[in-house]
């Protein structure tokens, strides 16, 4: 059905951004290989001393919320606008993050304390 395709599109939009960012971050610092990695990527971006990273982090948070609704709330309708908006947000977030330096990503990682 079309709604099933729209729900899938919302999820793919989230994972496109998440995987792009995860790959950029994990070359700088190993990331957990479990579900915690999703929150950690958002935490790095949201706490970064960089407005562009903060913006990308907020977009990733928004896309994750939309994905969770699309995947788990079957009573919620996912229309063309939601699907298109998710794809547009994902495209913009990836483009914005491509312009962010490795040094800015490293600074984002270093803001959070490391626990042993």
Where are these regions (language model features)?
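Terminal alpha-helical segments
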Residues: 1-116
